[in-house]
Amino acid sequence: AEFERTFIAIKPDGVQRGLISEIVARFERKGFSLVAIKVVIPSRPFAQKHYADLKDKPFYVGLVAYWSSGPVVAMVWEGEGVIKYGRKLIGATDPQKSEPGTIRGDLAVVNGRNIIHGSDGPETAKDEIKLWFKPEELVNYTHNAEKWIYGDN
């Protein structure tokens, strides 16, 4: 199996609404492995760094304020196709355009409060993981259920 890692964050609105276990459960049920998790309140400069690619957008200032408004659950998930599938699991950026069954489609209502972030590609995933976690915070292990998820048994 060709494993990769992705950065997933539950935004302050998702944390405040008590959606942590629901979101974690969806990634676990799919068969992905959680390799790092922590709860942080990002500083404004840290949030600016996370969204540096969007600094010219009109919504940038509000986005940074939102991200630094409360606790964020930062996670790294591992598995085959986890970046692409993680995005599918999350749903469209705008919850109104998200399919039912996706995290945003089921749990979020408006674009400005869409509860979750996921890396959009391999390079972004590497950069975001490096920004949010020290290498020693990432745990390497083989999940007991792996042979039942991927085969080869």
UniProtKB/Swiss-Prot annotation:
Molecular function in Gene Ontology: ATP binding; metal ion binding; nucleoside diphosphate kinase activity
Keyword Signal: no
Keyword terms of this UniProt record: ATP-binding, Chloroplast, Kinase, Magnesium, Metal-binding, Nucleotide metabolism, Nucleotide-binding, Phosphoprotein, Plastid, Thylakoid, Transferase
PROSITE patterns in the cross-refs: NDPK, NDPK_LIKE
List of residues binding ATP: 11, 59, 87, 93, 104, 114
Name by which UniProt lists this protein: Nucleoside diphosphate kinase 3
Matches recorded under InterPro entries: NDK-like_dom, NDK-like_dom_sf, Nucleoside_diP_kinase, Nucleoside_diP_kinase_AS
Top-rank taxon, per record: Eukaryota
SUPFAM superfamilies hit by this protein: Nucleoside diphosphate kinase, NDK
Biological role stated in the UniProt entry: Major role in the synthesis of nucleoside triphosphates other than ATP. The ATP gamma phosphate is transferred to the NDP beta phosphate via a ping-pong mechanism, using a phosphorylated active-site intermediate. Shows the highest specificity towards GDP.
Gene3D superfamilies (UniProt xref): Nucleoside diphosphate kinase-like domain (3.30.70.141)
Cofactor names: Mg(2+)
Location(s), subcellular: Plastid, Chloroplast thylakoid lumen
Catalytic activity from the UniProt record: a 2'-deoxyribonucleoside 5'-diphosphate + ATP = a 2'-deoxyribonucleoside 5'-triphosphate + ADP; a ribonucleoside 5'-diphosphate + ATP = a ribonucleoside 5'-triphosphate + ADP
pH profile of the protein: Optimum pH is 6.0.
